[in-house]
Amino acid sequence: MAADGSIILCTESGHVFLRTRNPKATQSGTKAFKFRRIPNVQRVTSVYGNNMGAFAALRADFPPDPIRLTGNLLSDDLTDILPFWDRCSAWYGLFSAPGDSALDGGDQEEEGNSLDNDVPRIRALCGFLFPASLGDPKSEISEGLYKTPGADIVIRVHKAPEVPAHRCVLVARSQVLASLLSGQTRVVRDAPSNVVIKVISGRLGRYARIEPLSVTGCHAISVLILLYYLYSDGILAVWDPRVPRDIVDQMRAYGKVDPHEIRSELKVLAKLLKLPLLVASLQNVTKLTPEPSVVKHFSCAFSAMQAPAGGEVYKPDVVLELEDRAVNCHSAVLRARSEFFAAFFNDEDWTRHRWTPEGTIVVHLKHVKWRPMEFVLRFLCAGEDAEMFDSLGQ
């Protein structure tokens, strides 16, 4: 209350009213004071006054509800496009044994290091690589395997079927592979183990217009487990003592490989490709889930490919034309993360005549500005979580 009788007060709803002397109070029947609401002031929690007649109001900022993102993680969706995984997924139940879902029991300390989901996947992986019987050493691989959407590179390993892969995943996950596939490096080699990774010039095998990447000096199953890590951030620990004996026998009989050899080869490959988190997880005899890194790598790749120099390394094949800028992306990631984009890019008739001479498809989204679309694309292409919204209002 001021010296002249003026009063300031706030309501429970956060509005402020000021009681002032009515200049018409001299007229009969007119009240001496009147209340008026202070405009454009909301969410007030307290009001103050001093002996000079000045008033103040303390306003609380609106606490918005936290934004929660639901759905698959980036690593989940990338696992779904793992080139050899469609066939393995079809066999997932076929190769599951009754005891596979309860392997660990009370011995398992951490759920993330459980083999409950891994053993059926290891069975499917062995079924993909190794023939069903010793009398069928040259079993044919289904032609459906070679129709992997978006595959633009093929990995060749001695005595194994060619496996298509996505260049954007390999380049984002390993700077060594990025250097190889962009032509900056011709070959990488580990001299003690004689493991060699190189890009083969020309076309070999049944793939046309697909870049061949050769890996020699290691078993095919080691390369496929490495691919599984690059796509999923997970690891299939075939050397874990908890893996059923029949799987180990299958690898030794048909693949001519001991599970502990695979672990050693993976260490060499991880060091060669500079994957320190994978190297750290391979120090244990039992499964140790690697620290997640897919989001970090894809965030860096998404930012880098927006620069002119990034196009040479990452080779984006989609340009989203927004109202105020153009954004470079990869169709393989967009189709894996969004049914909207999958409906376009999975249709060969839609894409056939839309490729530009630069090898890109331009998608016109001129009705959308970059500011709101930035968060959508950071979620789709980089897998970022709700923390990216912390910058709102800054």
Name each region found by the language model.
Residues 82-167, 228, 232-236, 243-335, ...:
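N-terminal BTB/POZ boundary and linker segment
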Residues 1-52, 57-133, 167-168, 235:
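Periodic beta-strand elements of RCC1/NHL beta-propellers and select beta-solenoids
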Residues 1, 360, 365-366, 392:
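Eukaryotic tandem repeat interaction scaffolds
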Residues 2-5, 31-35, 40-45, 52, ...:
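Eukaryotic intrinsically disordered and solvent-exposed regulatory patches
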